[in-house]
Regions:
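Beta-sheet-rich non-transmembrane sensory/scaffold domains
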Residues: 27, 43-484
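Initiator methionine at the very start of the polypeptide chain
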Residues: 1-2, 337
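C-terminal motif of bacterial Sec signal peptides marking the signal peptidase cleavage site
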Residues: 22-25
Length: 485
């Protein structure tokens, strides 16, 4: 999923000061690992944050302060002003009153330095990271299916250093902890599925700005590593013609869409979320090679502790168990090490391919009977034929106060291929999870805590749609929609 607006409705950039760090109500942590020491009782500790300063971003409702990076030596904040193709630099020398120091037009810089022929061919800025002397910015092309760029700026002078051309839709980037490389998640998101660019992880060596690419072609059908791709990795993209008619299935390399990445402390390994594919790729950075791909599996919302609210039209908080499965589909991820074991943390946001053209072989008709050349991925439960053996109470389940309004994937769930749905799969886990980075085993999931805690604090304003300020407005989609860590 392309980066979304993470700024507030006022389009402002806010600084916060963490006053105390801890986990509320944790109790004793016990023993960590085989040789770990006893944990510290954290029952009385809380997290408390207080806003220290605030400044208006450069544009209202335009993703104008979407991603930020702090440069400590100069006390500057680099903010991605996404749709304008700008980087806004704010001085935080006085953190109580940050001020705009400079806006850098990346489109003009790319043209002036011979990296692009016209500003119209340069799209949005998607990500920024800072390390040492450099700020690196991911910039997509226009259209986004073209090759994008990583622009390097000097953090002291804010001058252009160079730009490296990368794959289609560089969605997120970060420096390795040692600062030797910039690693870029190349999402390769299609515009309308007439073209589906390949996803990849692009690796730039900072010393000489050389580029290596870790791609996924070996996992294609017939590829040398096709057998290594777990069966539960979701691969279902399709190439269509200009009329939206099915031409062929996308390859694995075309279908995977690297979303976000985290780097191990030793700067040797990248962990990359493949959001739409419900998977994580592990990348050997030294050799620019995909080491393995983990399928993340599914969350059983029938189980105690995995409750969710599924309707935006029931005028109430109704966090309960329902006969659906959640696809974790993380956006941002992080990594850390405890007692020699590496772990991955995921924010299980979820994402569908509802806004891109997906036709079906032999014709395009949705389950409600309407002609359809777009959106063969996301449907509401009320519009799907449910298997009467799997759902004996299908008629009541499809009412709007129950599962009827819930958005699910039509690309999976017909387990016996008889044209109706035996299982229902929703987008996202409405949670965060911790995974063993070596095995891909899930060792923790926060279950229904996000919805329970926000409902307790905000009442029916939980699962709010920030665009419309609509209470309970996201319960039919991805609920609290955790995106960042």
């Amino acid at each position: 999923m392309k980066r979304k607006n993470l700024s507030s409705g006022w389009g402002s950039l806010a600084l916060t000061l963490v006053m105390a760090v801890g986990l509320a109500g944790c109790g004793s942590d016990g023993t960590d690992g085989i040789d770990g020491k006893d944990g510290v009782n954290g029952a009385g500790q809380v997290i408390s944050m207080q806003r220290l300063g605030r400044t208006a971003s450069q544009g209202f409702d335009q993703s104008a302060a979407e991603i930020v990076a702090f440069e400590p030596a100069g006390k500057n904040i680099f903010a991605v002003n996404a749709q304008s193709g700008m980087i806004d630099v704010f001085s935080a020398a006085d953190p109580t009153a940050p001020t705009l120091a400079q806006s850098i037009d990346l489109r003009t810089l790319l043209v002036a330095n011979g990296k692009a022929t016209d500003v119209a061919l340069v799209g949005a800025a998607n990500s920024v990271a800072v390390h040492g002397s450099f700020a690196a910015v991911a910039v997509e092309a226009s259209p986004k299916t073209g090759a994008g760029w990583v622009v390097f700026l000097n953090v002291d002078s804010l001058a252009y250093v160079t730009a490296v051309q990368v794959g289609s839709l560089p969605d997120m980037l970060t420096f390795t902890p040692d600062g030797s490389k910039v690693v870029v998640a190349i999402e390769g998101e299609p515009e309308d599925y007439t073209v589906d660019p390949e996803g990849s992880v692009d690796i730039i060596t900072v010393a000489d700005f050389s580029l290596q690419r870790a791609g996924f072609r070996e996992f294609n059908v017939g590829g040398s590593r096709a057998a290594e791709l777990p069966a539960e990795v979701r691969v279902f993209g399709q190439i269509v013609d200009s009329n939206g008619q099915w031409v062929r299935a996308s390859t694995v390399a075309e279908d995977v869409e690297p979303e976000y990445l985290a780097i191990s402390a030793d700067s040797q390994t990248a962990y990359v979320s493949l959001q739409e594919n419900n998977a994580v790729a592990v990348v050997d950075l030294a050799n620019a090679r995909i080491s393995k791909i983990f399928a993340l599996g599914f969350k059983d919302h029938r189980l105690p502790g995995n409750e969710l609210d599924v309707s935006d039209k029931d005028n109430q908080i109704n966090i309960a168990n329902w006969p659906v499965f959640g696809m974790f589909q993380p956006d941002s991820i992080a990594t850390y090490r405890v007692n020699g074991i590496d772990y991955i943390v995921t924010a299980n946001e979820g994402d569908s391919r509802a806004d891109w053209g997906i036709a079906q072989s032999g014709g395009a008709t949705d389950f409600a009977g309407d002609s359809l050349n777009l959106n063969m991925e996301e449907f509401r439960v009320k519009d799907l034929p449910l298997d009467p053996d799997a759902f004996s109470d299908a008629a009541s389940l499809q009412e709007k106060a129950q599962l009827g309004r819930l958005k699910v994937s039509a690309q999976m769930g017909d387990t016996d291929n008889d044209g109706d749905f035996d299982e229902l799969y929703v987008y996202g886990g409405r949670s965060f999870s911790i995974w063993n980075a070596a095995t891909g085993e899930r060792v923790f999931d926060s279950g229904s805590q996000m919805e329970l805690l926000t409902a307790n604090k905000y009442g029916t304003n939980f699962n709010n749609d920030n665009d419309e300020n609509d209470a309970d407005g996201r319960s039919d989609a991805k609920g609290p929609e955790p995106e960042g860590l």
